[in-house]
């Protein structure tokens, strides 16, 4: 991995403007900035001369401006705007609505990985071709309003609104929809204040998770309860299958309803013009090596922002990496520590860390060969034309930082191992030189090929790389590849397994290696876990590995009162946040703070293989940070034993802690373990509390509403 830092080469000779700028701003000592000795010695004389020159030039300019204003009073001078980043503005402020009498349709999105945003923009683009008397505005839910009052003021003015909202984690809204979701959910007292609104909602989720499309369902229900009129049934996109098909089916229900609202009488009888989505393409400019000799090769997203987030991560070195499984295990689990000293990045116990990893070298090399580009090919990538006009009506997401090499772009920014969407197949087909390849790709993306797409790509877990290998004549240009074929490589999230009370300058991660065979026989290697497994820590080399990271706040927190009893349930790497909890409790205990009872249910396969952090856990018990450690081993005895079985054995104790106002925390796999634990908890409450099924449901729900039953699941 690139160790960062600027490009090599000799010292650059400062220009006259550089010298003047440095003098006037007082930037550094001249001898430290690479000034020639003769200039450095006469710095004060140069300051005097350049300042005098600046004053004379300024007077001359002022005189000219005054004369021009007198001779042409009706013409208002416009200063040329520098091509520099403008002050941060919300998009809706920077781009006022056109006052042309057209009907406005607001298209909102709440997205975590970009899919909801992509659907919103795709729908708006198609709608523009169908309704020339309407204007479709694509709006980020977070940027729509600065505060709750503005949300209400602006939303009540909307006449037609479409919502694309994804469900993230344990039934939670995405980061950019969280503020809106919280505000909107507290709107019972507002009554039916949206009586003028016509709305439609398309949710994005995964049916394998317990709270499938919860956010979409809640938003749809709240819009109706608060007076809105539903124009199309709630769309439930399922990412476990083909969410594009779900989106297209929902659109077909939407168009007839929009026809009624947006077509004038003369147009209603006319059939809409058939729409063929254009294949998006960034503008790419190849850069000659000699023109790029001064390119900064460090990670360009780490750009000095005071607040680190998903768009502006912090570069962090890998300080420590060690294997947590014993040599007897054929699997792997990594303990990794990111060094955040001196970065300004902070975290709290229970937070998540987002990590931008890189595709492994062998994957990148295969795609380079398939595309027909050298890894050292330099290029810049743009979402606008040369005159600054946005491409595709501004619907393209901002491209990644450039100029960069093809090798760097494929390693850092392209998702090469997820299965390709149907729109990607169409883009590949348009650049396939073999007609058979093109025909087959288009068939897979067509309604007639729906079943085949589901079996050959989704069920078989065929990656984009594998599909490109099957159709070698498809060689799209870089602009098409990054805009329409390869999605942006997303950060991977991990529950932080440390406490800032113990390690304020380190963020600990506990990561299981993702490694297994797919139905096609390919060995799938997880992008981030493989990177962590192969990373070089600072304790081994100064040329250590690093990654752009950021902290995502979580509500998975210890009780504010440390005397409140807690139950923690986390098998495998689900132990991660509880290691942080226990570090926090130990630090508090060492300062004399009284602690409540704490029980940990941990699970692994075999004590001699994958009992991670065993010594640490025993130490937590010995020091009193942990009251009771209960471990389930699933591969030691004659029958498999999991954490939910241990919970059932401890049912009276669990009920006692709950009855005392205790908190329950669950971390780990949402599809299996978390469901089983939830059922077991339901049984314990029902049997120990002597409640019927209905009252049990209400009781468990009240624990969740009170924040006493928290889950960090994936």
From Swiss-Prot:
Enzyme Commission code: 1.6.2.4
Residue ranges annotated for the Flavodoxin-like domain, each copy included: 105-255
Transmembrane segments: 45-65
Lumenal side: 1-44
Cofactor: FAD; FMN
Reaction(s) the record says it catalyses: 2 oxidized [cytochrome P450] + NADPH = 2 reduced [cytochrome P450] + NADP(+) + H(+)
Natural source organism: Oryza sativa subsp. japonica
Manner of cofactor binding, per the entry note: Binds 1 FAD per monomer.
Region (Disordered): 74-103
Subcellular location(s) of the protein: Endoplasmic reticulum membrane
Xref: Gene3D superfamilies: 3.40.50.360, NADPH-cytochrome p450 Reductase, Chain A, domain 3, Nucleotide-binding domain of ferredoxin-NADP reductase (FNR) module, Translation factors
Annotated signal sequence range: none
Name the record gives this protein: NADPH--cytochrome P450 reductase 3
The keyword Ligase appears for this protein: no
Domain FAD-binding FR-type, first and last residues per copy: 311-559
């Amino acid at each position: 991995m690139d160790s960062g830092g600027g490009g090599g080469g000799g010292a650059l000779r400062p220009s006259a403007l550089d010298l003047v700028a440095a003098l006037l701003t007082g930037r550094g000592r001249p001898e430290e900035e690479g000034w020639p000795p003769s200039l450095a010695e006469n710095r004060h004389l140069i300051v005097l001369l350049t300042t005098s020159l600046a004053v004379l030039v300024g007077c001359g300019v002022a005189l000219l401006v005054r004369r021009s204003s007198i001779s042409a009073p009706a013409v208002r001078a416009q200063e040329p705007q520098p091509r520099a980043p403008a002050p941060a503005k919300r998009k809706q402020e920077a781009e006022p609505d056109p006052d042309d009498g057209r009907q406005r349709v607001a298209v909102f999105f709440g997205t975590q990985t970009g899919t909801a945003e992509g659907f919103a923009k795709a729908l708006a683009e198609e709608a523009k071709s169908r309704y020339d008397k309407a204007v479709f505005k694509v709006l980020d839910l977070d940027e729509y309003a600065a505060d709750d009052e503005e949300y209400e003021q602006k939303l009540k003015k909307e006449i037609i609104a479409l919502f694309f909202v994804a469900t993230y984690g344990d039934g939670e809204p995405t980061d950019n929809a969280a503020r809106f979701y919280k505000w909107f959910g507290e709107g019972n007292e507002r009554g039916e204040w949206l009586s003028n609104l016509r709305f439609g909602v398309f949710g994005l989720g995964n049916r394998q998770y317990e709270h499938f499309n919860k956010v979409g369902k809640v938003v749809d229900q709240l819009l109706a309860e608060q007076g809105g009129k539903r124009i199309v049934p709630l769309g439930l996109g399922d990412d476990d299958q083909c969410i594009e098909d779900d989106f297209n089916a929902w659109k077909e229900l939407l168009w007839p309803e929009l026809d009624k609202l947006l077509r004038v009488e003369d147009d209603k009888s006319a059939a809409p013009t058939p729409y063929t989505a254009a294949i998006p393409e960034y503008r790419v400019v190849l850069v000659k090596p000699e023109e790029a000799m001064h390119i900064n090769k460090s990670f360009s997203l780490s750009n000095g922002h005071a607040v680190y987030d998903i768009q502006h991560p912090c570069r962090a070195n890998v300080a420590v990496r060690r294997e947590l499984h014993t040599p007897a295990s054929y699997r792997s689990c990594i303990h990794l520590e990111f060094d955040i000293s001196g970065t300004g990045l902070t975290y709290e116990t229970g937070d998540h860390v987002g990590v931008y990893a890189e595709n492994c070298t062998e994957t990148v090399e295969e795609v380079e060969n398939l595309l027909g580009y050298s890894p050292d090919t330099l290029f810049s990538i743009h979402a606008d034309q040369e005159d600054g006009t946005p491409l595709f009506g501004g619907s393209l997401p901002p491209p990644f930082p450039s100029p960069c090499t093809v090798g760097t772009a494929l390693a850092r920014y392209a998702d090469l191992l997820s299965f390709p969407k149907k729109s990607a197949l169409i883009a590949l087909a348009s650049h396939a030189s073999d007609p058979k390849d093109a025909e087959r790709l288009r068939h897979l993306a067509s309604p007639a090929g729906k079943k085949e797409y589901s079996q050959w790509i989704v069920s078989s877990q065929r990656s984009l790389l594998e599909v490109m290998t099957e159709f070698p004549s498809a060689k799209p240009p870089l602009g098409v590849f990054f805009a329409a074929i390869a999605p942006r490589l997303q950060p991977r999230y991990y529950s932080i397994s440390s406490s800032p009370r113990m390690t304020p300058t380190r963020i600990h991660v506990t990561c299981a290696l993702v490694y297994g065979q797919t139905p096609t026989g390919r060995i799938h290697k997880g992008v981030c876990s493989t990177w962590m497994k192969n990373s070089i820590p600072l304790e081994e080399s100064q040329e250590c590995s690093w990654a752009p990271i950021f902290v995502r706040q979580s509500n998975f927190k210890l009780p504010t009162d440390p005397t409140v009893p807690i139950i923690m349930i986390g098998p495998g790497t689900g132990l991660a946040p509880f290691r942080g909890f226990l570090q926090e409790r130990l630090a508090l205990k060492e300062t004399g703070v009284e602690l409540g009872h704490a029980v940990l249910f941990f699970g692994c396969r075999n004590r001699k293989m994958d009992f991670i952090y065993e010594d640490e856990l025993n130490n937590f018990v010995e020091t009193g940070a942990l009251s009771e450690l209960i471990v389930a081993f699933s591969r030691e005895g004659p029958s498999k034993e999991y954490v939910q079985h241990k919970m059932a054995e401890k049912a009276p104790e669990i009920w006692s802690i709950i009855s005392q106002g205790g908190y329950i925390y669950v971390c780990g796999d949402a599809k299996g373990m978390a469901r089983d634990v939830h059922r077991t908890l339901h049984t314990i409450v029902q049997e120990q509390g002597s409640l019927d099924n209905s009252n049990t449901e209400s009781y468990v729900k009240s624990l969740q509403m009170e924040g006493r039953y928290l889950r960090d699941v994936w």
